[in-house]
């Protein structure tokens, strides 16, 4: 598959005050993964680490794990997806020390990126990017 997608806010049910359930989120995930695959795209699970054990059965091909070092969710993603995890750590939540700890702990097994949240273009003030 050449193209990739990563729908965000799979965990919206946790903030919906009962309007959405975990079952609703999983049903929506199945719809999105089916559509992505029909279009020839790979699709990532993003957020809702509690769904990681069922992620592949929901149709996800890999995971985008934001701040999993901060929230101690990395193990759930790597257990479910193996090396098919892309971890992103941010300067405003744990800083470079957190990123370095992530690299030391998992950097030889998965891709880890340190990036500014605003995705500032290279050469502009505020741009931050590292990878391990």
Protein language model features and the residues they cover:
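Short, small-residue-biased leader/transition segments that mark boundaries at the very start
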Residues: 1-2
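Hydrophobic residues within beta-strands of alpha/beta enzymes
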Residues: 5-7, 63
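Short, well-ordered beta-to-alpha junction loops that form the rim of enzyme active sites
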Residues: 8-10, 47-48
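Surface-exposed cleft-lining segments at the edges of enzyme active sites
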Residues: 10-23
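Surface-exposed substrate-engagement region within the catalytic domains
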Residues: 22-132
């Amino acid at each position: 598959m050449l193209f990739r997608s990563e729908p965000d806010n799979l965990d919206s049910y946790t903030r919906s005050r009962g309007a959405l359930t975990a079952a609703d989120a999983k049903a929506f995930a199945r719809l999105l993964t089916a559509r992505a695959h029909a279009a020839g795209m790979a699709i990532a699970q993003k957020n809702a680490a509690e769904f990681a054990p069922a992620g592949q059965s929901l149709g996800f091909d890999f995971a985008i794990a934001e701040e999993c070092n901060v929230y101690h969710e990395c193990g759930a993603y790597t257990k479910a997806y193996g090396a098919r995890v892309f971890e992103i750590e941010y300067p405003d939540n744990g800083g470079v020390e957190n990123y370095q700890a992530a690299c030391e702990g998992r950097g030889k097994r998965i891709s880890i990126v340190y990036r500014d949240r605003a995705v500032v273009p290279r050469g502009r003030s505020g741009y931050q990017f590292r990878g391990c």
